[in-house]
A protein has these predicted regions:
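Enzyme catalytic cores with a strong preference for nitrogen-chemistry domains
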Residues: 1-171
Length: 173
């Protein structure tokens, strides 16, 4: 994993992508995500964030309990990891992850063909149009180490950085 600083001023270029997602079209969404990762890498981006539940769409509702959909997501992540093996970019991609009887709303953290870990959503909204507790379990209190997408063990945990503070440079990077 070579993430050398590409700019002379010592900054890493980061980006967020918001590709068009089709509900339950895991293969199509994986292809669009791969395009976004490749384009970002070509532009010198070193860290890319893709949307929550990128592989399924956020509105898949009760389909999140469909084992075929869950297996398709894991297979798509295997493909994405394989096809990004040569890229020097860290990226996250959202997908549901089943562990035992629970399904977690996760972001897979990936780089150079490796699954570095899975960050699970801790606070699940359950009001108005949000019914996440119907489909997902909150992140486990303690990190779990699991085998997923042909790799592992990898951590599945909730990560909070509430103690960090950031400074805006005010410069167009």
């Amino acid at each position: 994993m070579d993430l050398h600083l590409s700019q002379s001023d010592g900054f890493l270029r980061v980006a967020a992508a918001s590709p068009r997602i089709r509900v339950a079209d895991v293969e199509g969404n994986a292809e669009v995500a791969l395009t976004a990762v490749r384009e970002a890498a070509e532009r010198g981006v070193r860290a890319l964030v893709l949307p929550e539940l990128n592989l399924t769409g956020y509105t898949a509702a009760d389909l999140f309990h469909n084992r075929t959909l869950l297996h398709a997501c894991e297979a798509a992540l295997v493909r994405i990891l394989d096809e990004t093996r040569e890229l020097s970019i860290v990226f996250t991609i959202g997908l549901p992850v089943a562990v035992a009887e629970n399904i977690y709303n996760c972001a897979a953290v990936c780089c150079a063909g490796e699954l570095l870990g899975l960050t699970s959503k801790k606070y699940l909204p359950n009001y108005g149009e949000f019914y996440e507790r119907r489909w997902f379990a909150p992140a486990p209190v303690d990190p779990m180490w699991i085998e997923f997408a042909g790799q592992g063990p990898v951590p599945l945990a909730s990560v909070s950085y509430t103690h960090l503070r950031a400074h805006e440079t005010g410069r167009n990077l």
